A protein has these predicted regions:
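Acidic, Gly/Pro-rich loop/turn segments at junctions of secondary structure
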Residues: 1-44, 98-99
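Short beta-strand->loop
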Residues: 11-22, 105-119
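Secondary-structure junction motif
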Residues: 30-33, 44-66, 132-140
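A late-sequence structural motif
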Residues: 30-32, 110-143
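Active-site-adjacent beta-strand anchor residues
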Residues: 48-49, 75, 93, 125
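Hydrophobic hinge/microswitch elements
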Residues: 54-110
């Protein structure tokens, strides 16, 4: 979600875009889960973002819609930590497909399958409606 202004601080959200989410796992969990995806997620340990996350509520709805009751082994707030635990055989985890190339380069994980309909949204947050910083202006123009 975009940032919310408060009475003490006025902030503005500038959309940078969004990305579909995929399920990733170590080579071991890829072997177990790839062929029968998404039903196979019920038979592997899952690492999920905490319930504070917008993506988590989307993931919960997606899993319920698929009729899956997976084994949740950890709820992790930080996406980098989620990736770290997922790359060490602790379980399967969700991550943005837009970052797949970098994720595969950094970690020994594989894409198990896409989580259709679940998206991560990205925003630049500023204290002014008009962004003044030249680099941020360039990023916003490219979106």
């Amino acid at each position: 979600h975009p940032a919310q202004s408060s009475s003490q601080l006025k902030v503005h959200s500038h959309s940078l875009g969004s990305s579909d989410i995929g399920w990733y796992g170590s080579p071991h969990w890829w072997e177990v889960a790839h062929a029968g995806f998404p039903a196979s997620l019920q038979h592997v340990p899952l690492l999920l973002p905490t319930t504070h996350s917008v993506v988590r509520s989307q993931l919960d709805r997606w899993l319920a819609h698929k009729g899956l009751r997976p084994q949740l082994v950890a709820e992790i707030e930080d996406s980098a930590l989620l990736e770290t635990f997922g790359s060490t055989d602790l379980g399967v985890f969700p991550a943005a497909l837009v970052a797949e190339k970098e994720l595969l380069k950094r970690s020994q994980v594989r894409l198990i399958g896409a989580c259709e309909g679940v998206q991560e949204h990205y925003y630049a947050i500023s204290t002014e409606r008009k962004v003044m910083h030249p680099l941020v202006q360039r990023i916003l123009k490219q979106t």
